[in-house]
Amino acid sequence: MQVSDFHFDLPDELIARYPMTERTASRLLQLDGQTGALRHGQFVDVLDQLNPGDLLVFNNTRVIPARMFGQKASGGKLEVLVERMLDEHSVLAHVRSSKSPKPGTRLILDGGADGEKVEAEMRARHDALFEIHFLDPRPVLEILEAIGHMPLPPYIDRPDEDADKERYQTVYNQKPGAVAAPTAGLHFDEPLLEKIRAKGVETAFVTLHVGAGTFQPVRVDKIEDHHMHSEYAEVPQEVVDAIAATRARGGRVIAVGTTSVRSLESAAKVTLAQGKPLAPFFSDTDIFIFPGYQFQVVDAMVTNFHLPESTLIMLVSAFAGYDNVMSAYQAAVAEQYRFFSYGDAMFVTRRRAQA
């Protein structure tokens, strides 16, 4: 298939630049992957789509304040976006500046209102990423909390604000490391989670530290030629056990977000392909899911509306059928749903292979 097959026209005013006042106030477009049928509603209607015995799988990564501003010691301005923490004092990062820093370059990173400055050094370059070592005794996370900004996606097109520290974060986040939010999870608040549990729906948590590569455009014509960026994922034993128990009782595995889908399917790719049962997974993954992929674990998913020609709309198309998904997106535009990270959501069931 061509990347252009996944294009759709999106009016700029449908890009959500701020979240709704309440997390659950978003709208929900329900798509039956088998029939293509659509139903319009509110996000709280997700409760009606869940059955006792189902398993909801969330991504519990925590977004770190990964964006920093400063200058080289020689004076040139720069912007640093952390992609991955290497250890307590070093990171891999994207660096934007008029000239790329060379190994040994000193960086002076600016703090907030108190004028704090942190020194760092560029140690090495790894393709598009720079290895940066902080010349500060504090751990990386502490430094980022002190001087970093929330790394809002480029299409939000505004500076980060204090409210983003809470709203660009799920309520159940636990493990710091993401530089983009697992956005399907932003719609859940504690009262809704309590209602979900009270209905007899089980919950489990994987971790996938979403990287900045999630916003990179696909730069090839044929989707089969695209190489995915790599991200670290964890599917612990308790998730494997929860999935087995769900299957045994006839329930469905419902992934909250494409990152949860990719985590679960990455684990399955390693073991089920060998004819072995699902096993824990703690590794980098570059799994690329596009139409033709055979899903092994996930039966339904909650997901936001994604960018045209992105790997994420390709994943949803693989899940629910290309024609169904593109028609749903056309309907969403016509009905003026809000798009992308702070936008509305879909509840999508999987399209089964025809007998």
Curated annotation (Swiss-Prot):
UniProt catalytic activity: 7-aminomethyl-7-carbaguanosine(34) in tRNA + S-adenosyl-L-methionine = epoxyqueuosine(34) in tRNA + adenine + L-methionine + 2 H(+)
Pathway entry: tRNA modification; tRNA-queuosine biosynthesis
Enzyme class, spelled out: transferase
Main location: cytoplasm
GO molecular function: S-adenosylmethionine:tRNA ribosyltransferase-isomerase activity
Enzyme Commission identifier(s): 2.4.99.17
Location within or outside the cell: Cytoplasm
Top-level taxon of the source organism: Bacteria
GO terms for cellular component: cytoplasm
DNA-binding keyword on record: no
GO BP of this protein: queuosine biosynthetic process; tRNA wobble guanine modification
Keywords: Cytoplasm, Queuosine biosynthesis, S-adenosyl-L-methionine, Transferase
Subunit structure comment from the entry: Monomer.
Function: Transfers and isomerizes the ribose moiety from AdoMet to the 7-aminomethyl group of 7-deazaguanine (preQ1-tRNA) to give epoxyqueuosine (oQ-tRNA).
Family assignment from sequence similarity: Belongs to the QueA family.
Protein name: S-adenosylmethionine:tRNA ribosyltransferase-isomerase
Source organism: Aeromonas hydrophila subsp. hydrophila (strain ATCC 7966 / DSM 30187 / BCRC 13018 / CCUG 14551 / JCM 1027 / KCTC 2358 / NCIMB 9240 / NCTC 8049)
